[in-house]
Amino acid sequence: MLQNSKAFGSFSTNNIEDAREFYGNTLGLNVKDNPMDILEVHFPGDSHIIIYPKPDHRPAVFTVLSFPVKDIDQAVDGLIAKGVTMERYEGFKQDEKGIVRSESAEQGPSIAWFTDPAGNIL
């Protein structure tokens, strides 16, 4: 029934202007305004997400968006240089940069978390 659908994700923010600045300028993503006061964030491969304003927004307590990168150190260093702080979580062995290092492909990728201005985990 939905196998040919181009699914997309969405999440809320408490301030659409802050979201536009963060996703567009801080992260350098392709952000487009939607006539419904919704942000569309477009990615390579014709995929996108939407970010919508919500007055009673509550930050997600789980990762809402993941960015696979070839060089996690370079990505984290670049984010830190733009003022982004890496999150630290109890129960994870994180290095001085806040990266959880994977030792093998079976363990999955190395991971670092940060939040957007609305507190959503990325």
Question: PLM ranges: what are they?
Answer:
Residues 15-16, 69-73:
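Helix N-cap motif at beta-to-alpha junctions
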Residues 22, 73-78:
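Short amphipathic alpha-helices within nucleic acid-binding modules
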Residues 24, 39-41, 84, 93:
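A generic "structured core" feature
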Residues 17-30:
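Amphipathic alpha-helical segments
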Residues 1-20, 48, 62-65:
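N-terminal beta-strand motif that seeds the catalytic metal site of vicinal oxygen chelate
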Residues 29-70, 87-88, 107, 121-122:
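Conserved short beta-strand elements that form part of the metal-binding/catalytic scaffold
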Residues 1-2, 67, 76-122:
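Vicinal oxygen chelate
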Residues 8-10, 38, 111:
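A short, glycine- and basic residue-enriched loop/turn
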